[in-house]
Amino acid sequence: MSLPRIALDAMGGDVGVRVMIDGAAEARRRHDRFKFLLVGDETRIKAALDTHPNMRGASEILHCEDVVGGDEKPTQALRRAKTTSMGLTVNAVKQGEAGAAVSAGNTGALMAMSKLALRTMPGIDRPALAGVMPTLEEDDVVMLDLGANTEADARNLVQFAIMGAAYSRILTGREEPRVRLLNIGTEEIKGTDALRDAAAQLQDAAGLAMQFDGFVESDKINRGQVDVVVTDGFSGNIALKAIEGAARFVTDLLRNAFTSSIRSKVGFLVSRPATELLKHHLDPNNHNGAVFLGLNGVVVKSHGSANSVGVANAVAVAASLLENDLTARIASDLAELGERMWDATGGNGNGPAPK
């Protein structure tokens, strides 16, 4: 099965052109169906491509030297959307020159450019940034929003739940993913009005392709008891950074412990297979690729410091969403929900509104 090519912002992120191209080549080694539109400085891209013969005939270069800065405000970046590698990468999806966009650049700028170029889907007020994290079980957990919206009302949270469940079905194959709202407790009286209202709407709605299980606390996110965790972008980003920090802390703690004495070094050699498995499980590069859900197109955000394996995984996420037509799945779920939950006469003109 052929795939639409993937537009890759070769200039975005902290790692440079070579790592981005190495990642694209690694993705193509895994799946030779992948083809790319590489956006960035042609001279630097060609130099990086010289070591990857598998990219010959599978990539086209769109020359661009201008880059969105890591600390650049979204409003400033938008004014340069037609001249920057990030803007041209997203525009390739809008123009049908690519099926998906992947960038490791400034998250706020990428969201702003994507929303302006691709617009939000009917029935969705705000896009959300969704990522996956490891759990104690086989399947990863989807979490959104991870920072696209610092605030979210009940309507937004319900929409996030629908989008997150559609994404989880692609990842896990589970027809009715277990969905919970992130809260400070699991009791019905806990949390903000928005959380309680969203919970009531999800609990009462019929026809949702999910199993809504109420609230979840942050210490249970990675236990394997939930498939989708829904929250506003402010809380979601804090939770994500806390989990990533805890993972690094555990990794560093083990490294220090295993190098503290001769005996501990011997112990490391004995336990190395287990520790390598733990390291692999906690490595963010193995879970790289957050998705802007709710847009009329596929846009994937790679971590700015991702290595070539991480970039390859972000490309794989984009390809999976194209293969499984995530946008159409979300649209179908929203349409199926219909009058059972929304008052079609309300809202802001961008979709139905909650009763």
UniProtKB/Swiss-Prot annotation:
GO terms for biological process: fatty acid biosynthetic process; phospholipid biosynthetic process. It comes from the Bacteria. It is found in: Cytoplasm. It catalyses: a fatty acyl-[ACP] + phosphate = an acyl phosphate + holo-[ACP]. Pathway: Lipid metabolism; phospholipid metabolism. GO terms for cellular component: cytoplasm. Its main location: cytoplasm. One of its GO terms (molecular function) is phosphate:acyl-[acyl carrier protein] acyltransferase activity. SUPFAM superfamilies: Isocitrate/Isopropylmalate dehydrogenase-like (SSF53659). It is an enzyme of class 2 (transferase). Keywords: Cytoplasm, Lipid biosynthesis, Lipid metabolism, Phospholipid biosynthesis, Phospholipid metabolism, Transferase. Its EC number is 2.3.1.274. Gene3D superfamilies: Isopropylmalate Dehydrogenase (3.40.718.10). Catalyzes the reversible formation of acyl-phosphate (acyl-PO(4)) from acyl-[acyl-carrier-protein] (acyl-ACP). This enzyme utilizes acyl-ACP as fatty acyl donor, but not acyl-CoA. HAMAP family: PlsX. Belongs to the PlsX family. Homodimer. Probably interacts with PlsY. This is Phosphate acyltransferase. It comes from Erythrobacter litoralis (strain HTCC2594). The lineage of its organism: Bacteria, Pseudomonadati, Pseudomonadota, Alphaproteobacteria, Sphingomonadales.
